[in-house]
Curated annotation (Swiss-Prot):
PANTHER family: DYSFERLIN-RELATED, TECTONIN BETA-PROPELLER REPEAT-CONTAINING PROTEIN 1. It comes from the Eukaryota. It comes from Drosophila melanogaster. Pfam families: Gal-bind_lectin, Hyd_WA, Pex24p, Tectonin. The gene is Pex23. Residues 396-420, 671-691 are annotated as: Disordered. One of its GO terms (biological process) is peroxisome organization. This is Tectonin beta-propeller repeat-containing protein. TECPR repeats lie at residues 23-59, 233-271, 280-320, 336-371, 966-1000, 1187-1223, 1232-1269, 1278-1322.
Length: 1350
């Protein structure tokens, strides 16, 4: 499951965090500042320091916060001067925003604070709607409020170009001071702060709400806070009722605000919506008991829960609070009444999913409220959280440990052992150190060393005079260098900047080259031993902080697990907690982290104990002796394995037919072989079974087939209709797949688990698949795998003959067709034996290719292609050899030597050599035939005439993969996209863009425990349902739900073809649950007005946010979110959300890898949720998860990425442009820069895949394109060749014409729009586009990965 963090502050003011994937507390690096109050949301901490000022801490971001600043330069054409800087009085500003309403001079655009740095200089954006512009970047139009184009025309009277520059938040993983209210911070300090608002209904993504309370009891709201603006803009005072002085405040995920007054009462802020985050007014809420002595001292707000603590240390729960409706309903905001809880509590914190954490009043320990669910929001009892603690040497708590330990030593590597063993190790005697405030450290003039023996700290004035060079970016240092710098920085000084700032910030003016010595930005001033922000003068004030380049990346903790400085201790001493913040943690009440098991030295298990080794050795020797016994089969079996039958009522559907009632029956017969582990394959080979579909009365059999014929069992449920599909290609035509519908989800899952289990046993496929397996996902998110090792076992493989497939022709008559899935590459041989009938006039053997398809404006032309035509003609006493291209025969070759005769048997061998076919008849060379058509384009064998076939053998140097006979085994989990490297590194991306790593297991929820491994983890995914509301305008009543007969449905999907409604939208299974109500989606592409409407001239047109005079239709999108709970052999990749990923084993790594170690490095790239590029370091066979992300900037937000075997990286931008990364090498794995690859006019791509078989891309019209003329000197190729999407040409149909996804490795595989798995055949260096598709089963597939398949 994903990892989340629980934060807490100790009585010393130190901040600790506890991960859901860990069982130990870790301390955030101590920088000399203590904290009195902390609050958290994912990746953001706000706190009140010991100086009563507000601080913000941004952590866990793999992608830095990077904002793009834009300024449009406008010019107008004048009759004499031409295009000039002189504008009309009614025109927009010379430098303006996109709409011209705001002046945006490049010399006036400043950094928001010292926590930001410029990332590059001003430069031109040379792109317009996916099309490149000229070098000067001008866009032309008739007038300013008009549509711009890249080309100048005779009526272009205005032009503009866009200047862009990026700024980056440089204070990651460090505390940054927020500007105080007054120039003197001590005039009105802060006493409380709260953050929330992550789930304000319909608010833009990344919205945050921050409230604070000053020492004067005033409520302050921080405007402009978001995930891209961690500090916000300014403090805004929010009036409170007369006589109300606030003491404490809390903000929920939906923006609901509760505040505690000094008199013990609480007030609630109402009217908090996406358009008004501050809210409208305050409402008073009575205390739990109307008694003068009972006062509320603390309150915490969740989504649908509010908890408070009174002055008698009792906890209370508020009933009736509904966070989603709190902004529009006062009753939902204030609730209905109080419920008293048992416990002695001093403070409470409610998480976003209403889980509750608290601190005890007497023992100051941390507790969790167990059993909190939506049905029981108050929970059951308080559970003590007991976890080991990592504390700093500077903590006074270390003195307790040192006195307990008796002065023994500790090593940095000791924490890598189990916590049970840690406590038994002797620890180094601790030294109690007093923590000096920052003011004291800064004024120190002595050369005292830090506690870890580092160099003397710099003086205050010396620190301000450090080099003004820009700090190294994230991509400029490797991980080891960055870690050394971070460690050295910790040794060098015991304090850090609370408001990191750039040394010299460049602000461009005029010609974009002038530098101000000190730009206007947030500059720290010393106050009460801390560092707080104030507005600095750009010229007079000096740059007072060196840029903090040692803290970046996603690590919340300095150095993560490696504590080489020895500054951290692991201990079990009791910490007195003063504050807990659960806003960033999400835990499942039914699957809690391992936080509650007390670790003691008595519970440790020594796996290397002598007694344990002795027992294991004896068991192994006994097993070896049993394996050598020859008479094991004569012993009577302890348990007699017999067959079993499982039956149930269901509904059966033939393809294209209706569902009808039936009885299904599964019969399993076990071989019951011995228990010898060495003969497990033989024992399972005897397993068998049958599946039968009977009539409702059981009298007639509708269909019956052996379980060995099943190639795939998958769920194909629809809303309210639980179904499974059984694929068995050996069934009669139009009988596969067999679809069965059940009465409930539980019954469907029961049959799915049994069928999957027995099919895996019959095919001897359990556990981890081979590294070169093909992975695939279905529309429902199920993960399947094809293991070629299983198919290899069924093909005779001899060193001299390669792989052999024997085709069953016992019941076949001519004309005979059979697919040759590997074509006829060099070394392939086709052997045909049979008998010619006495009355035969002629016989025919053809090696056929896919028909050449040409799409004309009003028709589709198919042209036959035959690579080899062997035609013995007995009536003419000759044999004809020929080829056909584009339905026309070429020059034929006649051979009067007759090797075939009527009434005689024959043996024909066609062997593909380097440049010709060698034809052998009756073991004698008959002739050869030079290639006229590429032999690799051959797809099938055709035999006709009066002939009886005996055998057909197909020999090939490579594995013969029959598309219809590929067995797809379900692996478990819920994944949308899958990526396989070929060396046991498999990644996946779920619907909510969470990255997952395959851990080598098998099983999950779909198997119900019948099979599988122990590496199963819970998985949670979220999905959003959309419904479109459509309206048409009429002159009388305006926009109404009344439509024309030719219009789309008034409630529909995005295309308007499918009727949808909010009332009839149902969940797919019982594992899904709604987590929101229907709401208007204001973040729809193209924008929307205040009511969520989009306008257009007519329905199949482009939509925009504001109504125009010619707009006659409008629509708006409604959304509702659901959560799916599943399980599978996957673990979370990282905290960062990713849109796409690419895994590739580079050719240079294969050459240098050691086959004995089998630890091959993998190039791993990904696209972050904001469109930036990430490269994952440390990914290899033994470490599939890798170590850390490194960020690579991009001017355009990207959506797709792929890596080739030579290391080349290709990406697709959100606007459809394609980019190529050049400069990548072993010494420079990140490359140098992006180079645009121009696409044909009007074409926008959405996905790309690179492999040994070429560079393939998928555009927005679901067409596939292949890059032509690729060479070593020109690796990006010259142009794109598009494959035609012809209706009714397989795999296309009239309604589904195109492809969903494509994957390129040594072969090219794709998923068609109708869910069929396809493999491209006939790909050669001369023809990289291939000639046609070989089709597999129609499993409603979604995504396939063949990058690792060889």
């Amino acid at each position: 499951m994903p990892s989340f963090y629980l934060f807490a502050a100790s009585s010393e003011g130190r901040v600790y965090t506890l991960s859901t994937n860990s069982g130990a507390w870790r301390e955030l690096p101590y920088l000399g500042l203590e904290f009195k109050k902390i609050c958290a949301v994912p990746n953001f901490l706000w706190a009140i320091g010991g100086d009563r000022q507000v601080y913000v801490h941004v952590h866990g971001l793999d992608v830095p916060i990077r904002i793009r600043e834009e300024s449009y330069e406008n010019e107008r054409w004048l009759p004499i001067e031409g295009f000039s800087k002189t504008l009309l009085p009614t025109d927009r500003y010379r430098y303006s925003s996109a709409d011209g309403s705001v002046e945006r001079g490049v010399d006036k655009i400043r950094l928001p604070s010292m926590a930001w740095q410029w990332d590059g200089d001003w430069h031109l954006d040379l792109e317009l709607d996916g099309q490149p512009l000229t070098e000067d970047g001008w866009m032309y139009a008739l007038d300013f409020p008009a549509t711009y184009s890249a080309k100048k025309s005779w009526n272009s009277y205005v032009r503009r170009r866009k200047w862009v520059r990026y700024r980056r938040y440089a204070a990651l993983n460090s505390w940054c001071a927020v500007a105080p209210l007054h120039k003197d911070p001590t005039q009105e300090p802060f006493i409380d702060v709260a953050i929330g608002g992550t789930c304000v209904p319909n608010a833009p993504a990344g919205t945050l709400c921050v409230w604070a309370i000053t020492a004067h009891g005033r409520a302050m709201f921080r405007t402009g806070v978001s995930k891209t603006a961690p500090e916000g803009l300014r403090w805004t005072a929010v009036p409170t009722p007369t006589g109300s002085e606030l003491a404490q405040i809390s903000v929920g995920p939906t923006g609901l605000v509760w505040a505690v007054l000094h008199n013990g009462r609480v007030i609630v802020r109402t009217g908090v919506t996406r358009d008004n985050l501050v809210g409208d007014s305050w409402l008073d809420v009575k205390t739990p008991v109307a008694a003068s002595s009972l006062r509320i001292v603390h309150v915490s707000v969740g989504t649908d829960a509010v908890w408070c603590v009174t002055n008698d240390h009792h906890a209370w729960f508020r009933r009736g609070v509904k966070g989603e409706a709190a902004g529009i309903s006062e009753d939902s905001a204030i609730g209905k009444g109080w419920v008293e809880m048992v416990g002695n509590i001093s403070m409470v914190s409610v998480a976003a999913n209403d889980q509750v954490f608290a601190i005890g009043a007497a023992d100051r320990c941390l507790y969790h409220r167990s059993g909190v669910t939506s049905a029981d929001p108050t929970g059951k009892k308080w559970r003590l959280i007991q976890c080991p603690m990592q504390i700093s040497r500077t903590s006074s708590s270390l003195s307790i440990v040192s006195r307990k330990s008796g002065g023994s030593s500790s090593t940095p590597g000791s924490k890598h052992q189990s916590f049970s063993n840690l406590y038994s190790k002797e620890k180094e005697k601790g030294v109690v150190e007093t923590c000096a405030v920052i003011e004291t450290v800064l004024n120190s003039s002595t050369g005292s060393c830090s506690s870890n023996g580092g160099p003397p700290g710099l003086l205050k004035n010396e620190r301000w005079k450090l080099s003004a060079d820009s700090p190294p970016t994230i991509g400029s240092l490797n991980l080891n260098d960055r870690h050394k710098q971070r460690t050295a920085a910790l040794r060098e000084t015991s304090h850090a900047s609370s408001a990191p700032a750039a040394d010299v910030v460049e602000v461009v003016t005029g010609k974009f080259e002038t530098q101000l010595r000190n730009p206007r930005a947030w500059s720290p001033v010393r106050s009460v031993g801390s560092v707080v922000g104030t507005e600095a003068h750009p010229e007079s004030d000096s740059t007072v902080f060196e840029s903090d380049s040692t803290h970046h990346g996603s690590d919340v903790f300095l150095g993560e697990d490696d504590d080489h400085t020895g500054s951290q201790f692991w201990t079990e001493c009791g910490i007195l907690w003063s504050c807990v913040a659960s806003g960033a943690v999400t835990v499942d009440a039914s699957n809690m982290p391992n936080w509650f098991n007390e670790q003691t030295s008595d519970s440790k298990v020594d796996v290397n104990a002598n007694w344990r080794k002795d027992i294991v050795n004896k068991l192994q020797r006994r097993q070896e002796k049993l394996a050598k016994l020859q008479t094991v089969a004569k012993f009577e079996k302890a348990v007699e394995l017999s067959s079993w039958v499982k039956s149930a009522d269901a509904r059966y559907q033939r393809p294209g037919g209706e569902f009808e009632d039936c009885i299904i029956e599964l019969e399993w017969v076990s071989s019951g072989s011995g228990t010898d582990t060495n003969s497990s394959e033989n024992s399972r080979s005897g397993d068998s079974g049958t599946f039968t579909v009977l009539s409702p009365d059981g009298a007639a059999t509708k269909i019956q087939f052996p379980l060995s014929d099943i190639t795939c069992v998958q769920c194909c449920s629809e809303a309210g209709a639980p179904r499974i599909a059984i694929h068995a290609p050996h069934l009669p035509v139009n009988c596969s797949p067999v679809k069965l519908q059940f009465s409930s989800d539980s019954e469907m899952e029961d049959w799915l688990s049994h069928l999957s289990s027995v099919c895996s046993q019959i095919n001897t496929m359990v556990g981890k698949p081979a590294g070169n397996a093909i992975w695939i996902t279905s529309e429902l998110g199920d993960v399947f795998v094809f293991d070629p090792a299983n198919m290899k076992a069924h093909q005779t493989s001899e060193p001299s003959e390669g792989y052999v497939e024997k085709m069953d022709v016992s019941t076949c008559e001519t004309p005979y067709y059979n697919t040759l899935y590997n074509g006829m590459p060099c070394g392939t041989e086709l052997e045909i034996s049979g008998c010619v009938y006495d009355d035969a006039d002629q016989i025919r053997f053809d090696l056929q290719s896919h028909s050449a398809v040409k799409v004309q404006p009003h028709r589709v032309e198919k042209h036959r292609v035959i690579a080899l035509h062997l035609n013995p003609r007995f009536n003419e006493r000759t044999t004809v050899l020929n080829s056909m291209k584009e339905s026309e025969w070429l020059d034929e070759i006649r051979n009067d030597k007759m090797a075939f005769a009527p009434g005689a048997t024959f043996s024909l061998k066609i062997r593909a050599l380097q440049d010709h076919y060698l034809i052998i008849v009756n073991n004698a060379v008959y002739t050869d035939y030079k290639y006229r058509i590429d032999p690799e384009s051959v797809t099938r064998l055709y035999v006709s005439g009066r002939i009886k076939l005996f055998n057909v053998l197909y020999r090939c140097p490579s594995l013969i993969v029959s598309m219809e006979r590929m067995h797809w085994r379900q692996m478990g989990g819920h994944i949308k996209r899958i990526f396989n490297s070929g060396v046991d590194v498999v990644w996946g991306i779920s619907c909510d863009n969470t990255g997952w790593v395959y851990n080598g297991g098998w099983g999950g929820m779909f198997l119900k425990g019948l099979e599988g491994s122990g590496k199963i983890n819970p998985m949670i995914d979220t999905h959003t349902y959309y419904v479109y509301e459509n309206q048409r305008w009429n002159p009388i009543s305006g926009f109404t739900a009344k439509s024309l007969p030719t219009d789309r449905h008034m409630w529909s999907d995005a295309t308007g073809r499918q009727k949808r409604s909010k009332e009839h939208t149902k969940l797919l299974s019982t594992h899904c649950e709604w987590i929101s109500d229907w709401a208007i989606d204001y973040n729809i592409p193209g924008g929307a007005d205040k009511e969520g409407w989009q306008y257009a001239i007519d329905f199949p047109a482009n939509y925009h946010a504001h109504k125009k005079l010619t707009d006659c239709v409008r629509r708006r999108r409604w959304m509702k979110r659901c959560r799916l709970s599943s399980s599978g052999p996957w673990q979370e990749l990282s905290q960062s959300k990713i849109l796409d990923a690419a895994l590739q084993v580079l050719d240079e790594d294969v050459d240098h890898s050691c086959s004995g170690e089998r630890n091959t490095a993998v190039a791993a790239w990904a696209i972050a949720s904001n469109g930036d590029v990430l490269i994952r370091h440390g990914v290899c066979s033994l470490n599939p998860r890798g170590d850390a992300w490194e960020h690579i900037t991009s001017d355009q937000p990207l959506v797709g990425i792929s890596v080739g075997p030579t290391g080349q990286v290709w990406t697709v931008a959100r606007n459809g442009m394609v980019f190529f990364r050049y400069g990548i090498s072993r010494q420079n794995p990140c490359g140098d820069a992006w180079q645009q690859v121009e696409a044909p006019a009007g074409v926008t791509f959405k996905a790309i895949s690179v492999g040994r078989a070429g560079i393939w891309a998928l555009d927005n019209q679901q067409r596939l394109a292949v890059r032509k003329e690729i060479s070593r000197t020109f690796p990006e190729g010259s142009h794109w060749q598009f494959l035609p999407n012809a209706a009714n040409v397989p795999p296309h149909t009239d309604q589904h014409c195109g492809f969903r996804s494509v994957s390129v490795g040594s072969e090219v595989w794709a998923i068609s729009l109708n869910g069929i798995i396809c493999r491209r055949c006939g790909i050669t260096e001369e023809n990289p586009a291939g000639v046609g598709w070989n089709l597999g089963i129609a499993g409603q597939w979604q995504n396939v990965s063949v990058e690792g398949y060889m």
